[in-house]
Amino acid sequence: IISWDAFSFSNAMSSLIYLRDPGDKTLQERVYRELMAYCKEGIYGIGRVFTAEEAEKEEHLKGDFSFVVESDGYTSFADKAVRPLVVEFDDRDYRFGHATHGYLPDRGAQPVFAAQGPDIREGIVLERGKVVDEAPTYASLLGVTLLDTEGEPMEEFLKA
């Protein structure tokens, strides 16, 4: 590759889109329009396009990327830069299988959070939790407070 405007960094069921010049509003608008057209067309496996701002606000995901592309639930994204850009399912690379990561929290595997110990209340069940609350919970169990972090300790589990 000798010249580029944008590239995709795969996270399997989602992909981060980086721009060569994130400050170039014309480029940003062009790439956004193209991504939205791919999403609307329905054949490229894109279920949703997030701007960086939407990804941070809705999913606590932030970084130097400009967009996040979420799978339609059936498509894995790769890092190939050569044609063909759309290929049949191939499980030779574990990152692009059907049982992988990179989904939005309400899709794909739903991991279990389980805790036991002298500072954990017994019999507590939460139907849903937030990953951003796990580190503050662990810190609280250790008697420390995390500074400059998102999320809150899951007090429901903790003994007073």
Report residues per predicted region.
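Secreted, luminal/periplasmic, and some membrane-associated catalytic domains
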Residues: I1-F89, D93-R95
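Substrate-binding rim/cap in mid-to-C-terminal beta-strand-loop elements of soluble/periplasmic
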Residues: I2-K25, F96-L141
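A generic structural signal for short, solvent-exposed coil/turn residues
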Residues: F9, L61, P105, L146-D148
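Composition- and surface-driven signal marking solvent-exposed, interaction-prone regions
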Residues: V31, V82-R83, E127-R128, E150-E152
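Non-transmembrane alpha-helical segments in soluble domains
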Residues: Y32, M36, A135-A139, E155
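Short, solvent-exposed coil/turn linker segments
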Residues: G45, F50-T51, D119, K130, ...
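Terminal low-complexity/disordered tails
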Residues: Y138, L142-L147, A160
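Cytosolic regulatory/linker segments at or just downstream of nucleotide-handling modules
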Residues: E152-L158
